[in-house]
Amino acid sequence: MSQASPLPRYAVIGNPVAHSRSPQIHAMFSSQTGKPLQYERLLAPVDGFAATVQAFREQGGLGLNVTVPFKEEACQLAGAHLSERARLAGAVNTLWLRDGAWHGCNTDGVGLVSDLLRLGVVLEGARVLLVGAGGAARGVLQPLAAAGCARIHIVNRSAQRAHDLAAGWAAAGAVPGTRVTAGALAEAGVAGGWNVVVNATASSLQGAAPELPRGLYAPDALAYDMMYAAHPTAFMRQATDDGAARTADGLGMLVGQAAESFLIWHGVRPDPSPVLTALRATLLAKD
């Protein structure tokens, strides 16, 4: 680990972490806002998250972005100092020191909502299909509900996991104006179609799409994949074939959640748009 730096020190911690675009994103935010910082990657052993965080703190570290597989451990580390979003998600992707203690928030869902709004989606009263019932899905439920979605239907290959997520959400203190239901992948349809379909699975990393029935999309609906790539993902291609008016990948969500973390740490909200444009160009150039 590097020596203490005179600059405010931040990092992304995970395993693996070499692929992370967070250093590039936060460097651009730093230049944009005039907030100087040092931002690095921290590779933690799978069984060494707490020790790596402690060493980072002892060397002057002030804040961390947390990626797989440590988001649940980060939630435990922050203990009683969790935001409402983090409490409902059961996971933390942003840590910062305040009054000698680690505080935690989950900015993933805010990143998704901000990108959906950037794309012109009207979430107030929207019907949303959420595909997947893991941590990625759990992390976006509260922000989607808070944005005014009328219904969120969770479907998963294991229907029981979807039902468990919906039940846990209700038990944790759900947003009462949003109806949250669950079922199997085959139960993904709804009369009139969905306004937004979000793929919260990692299927696109394997070049596959979830096994969804046809006829899912309302007119002008958006299909959104949390994964991102230089070209449309398997889920995006499936959605276009099924009649989705528009598709988008998760690069904007990545930049959006990073912008929210930057705001928490530095008290200023950066503009995600030029950063997203630069990252997209980088993706295409490497293709």
Swiss-Prot record:
GO terms for molecular function: NADP binding; shikimate 3-dehydrogenase (NADP+) activity. GO terms for cellular component: cytosol. Pfam families: SDH_C, Shikimate_DH, Shikimate_dh_N. Keywords: Amino-acid biosynthesis, Aromatic amino acid biosynthesis, NADP, Oxidoreductase. NADP(+) binds at E84, G132, A133, G134, G135, A136, M226, G250. GO terms for biological process: amino acid biosynthetic process; aromatic amino acid family biosynthetic process; chorismate biosynthetic process; shikimate metabolic process. InterPro entries: Aminoacid_DH-like_N_sf (IPR046346), NAD(P)-bd_dom_sf (IPR036291), SDH_C (IPR041121), Shikimate_DH (IPR011342), Shikimate_DH-bd_N (IPR013708), Shikimate_DH_fam (IPR022893), Shikm_DH/Glu-tRNA_Rdtase (IPR006151). Signal peptide: none annotated. The active site is at K71. Pathway: Metabolic intermediate biosynthesis; chorismate biosynthesis; chorismate from D-erythrose 4-phosphate and phosphoenolpyruvate: step 4/7. Homodimer. Belongs to the shikimate dehydrogenase family. Involved in the biosynthesis of the chorismate, which leads to the biosynthesis of aromatic amino acids. Catalyzes the reversible NADPH linked reduction of 3-dehydroshikimate (DHSA) to yield shikimate (SA). This is Shikimate dehydrogenase (NADP(+)). It comes from Bordetella petrii (strain ATCC BAA-461 / DSM 12804 / CCUG 43448). The gene is aroE.
